[in-house]
């Protein structure tokens, strides 16, 4: 393979750091250059004094990092000076450089002392390539494979080979893996799918490539139609696409990476080889299919709930207006009643004629309303809601029905009849007549029968369709599942296979390193119950102390009342001290941070094979500042000498969630190494983190943007969940403003890839749920939420009594159901181990 085809893995600075002599401090010199008896004997066996010193230095370097070096004398003269002054006291030596043969002889002794082998392509190359091929199935990123190669060499006691050697091997592994997948697709793919992919790339098919990449930005019918178009065009290809990708055994990370290539190349995808086109498009089709299905489901749920809420609002307003109108029509009702005593009316007249005169005074509906008013009754809100649904026939037959027909439902024990009814409804609506003809009356409650059945007991089929739609949203919490959509599928789909769990349960528990999960439930529950009783007693004792300043127990009238003390504001928002510090530009701060951490190097090119030079350093800084200040690259281009096209290209090449996360970890890891970091700990040797959501108004509509009058007024926005430890933002996730923050607390902790691992986590009330207490405890975290209304929480959870000596006694109001925990302990273990493996 030509050198130009080798992937660029390390930057020049990283190459110098790995393949150059390490920079030892005085403490490092004392540690790495100390010799045992065997090492000292071999060093003294060399006749040339300079080579003895060089052996000690290279041996110390090899202990620090197992790399074969051939440094110049002036590069290591300080370490040589330390050796002949401290380790092997002597007169020193004149400047010299080792010849290749002398270097090889010295390293033979180093390998002997360290029990290592020199890298040899013939002996070790094939085994390393096989190992990297296995690793590539999980993640083909060159840096990941490079780290895996270093780890393999360390485990096999092999000196790290030259950078060019690893470049060549990794390039070959990546190339062979893609060639293998392309060859498999050539053999296994049907001719029809090959033609469809070719038409997609060339733009000659019924679905243009540009239209495939377009996705819905909100829940309007126009936007959701984009997802429906994609669904209709690729639906019949998806079984074969899923089968092909399953035979390739691609990891989720690899599949996502390959799918992103389609967005990166865009119309330029046709310049790639046919095999690469197939691979990228198949991965993209599966990802796009999942996205389309999820948005179709979200859109269906949104419109059903919105219609139900609008129907409720309409019904309440209609009933109120009807009541007001009835009150105004009481006088006209008197005229209707007067007809029965009017002497001018012939008694022989048919009642129909009199009735017609009455209806000329008041309509039938108004007359009914007056009757209800006189009886102090109101029209049923439910009736008005169904009348509203009757008026929304176009929505039901149009958008909702199209979305509904794209979904496949499965039920559990309590929803099998509903799932069967939904499937039957879909079959009938997909038929030639496209009409719903049958209904399962077993699903109707006694209350709903009044509005879904006519006077003769026949079901109102249009209302029945609405009834089915309204049953779906609230049952997607596990009662009903959508097996084709990750977000709505059954819990078992995300757990370890049941058969595999039964056979390998104890092995999996040991590999998870969860001490609590491996214990017997009865023993664990007894131990935790004792700890809880002890803790409740200690809290009671603490509250009795006179110097307790953290919580107020009684008010002046003697009534028990729990609240936090309100602290007065003694500090200024803008302390005058900070006015003495000179102002520094954000770009200068970023340059300083990059100088100390090198985080810019984390922004690798999306293709991986590009040079890792720093020629785009200033452009990346401009992009980061522009996006962070919500100005975007367009706003940055307007106020700088960078063009929009230039910034847009660099952003597409370098700025991704993966690289942004790596850069953030780089800065956080460097921060954690600073001596001052531990002084921010609230408790000694304990990292106390917090998680909370910040609300940001969004300029563009996406599927995550939601209305929230409290935070955005009439606009839409998102919530940015951030995990903070000692003022370092170690992880973040953007969620919808309508989503509960507590659902993402565990995910923030588990997806944290930095070296800062929290011990304690605090959230506000919005981050609390019962599951988080159990999960975080099982995974070794301490959950310590901070409640806004602490008095209400204490009164809801605890009974506070006093014994004969008037000492406080705390106990739970609702006892913990330990029997249920023990009964479902196997399921709890399976869920926890499954989460650990994610």
Where are these regions (language model features)?
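Structured, charged N-terminal subsegments at the starts of enzyme catalytic cores
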Residues: 530-639
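Active-site cores of enzymes that catalyze phosphoryl transfer or operate on phosphate-rich substrates
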Residues: 674-741
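Long amphipathic alpha-helical coiled-coil/heptad-repeat bundle
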Residues: 2-529
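Short, conserved catalytic/metal-binding motifs centered on acidic residues
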Residues: 66, 636, 689-695, 745, ...
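A short acidic (Asp/Glu
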Residues: 71-73, 647-650, 659-660, 699-702, ...
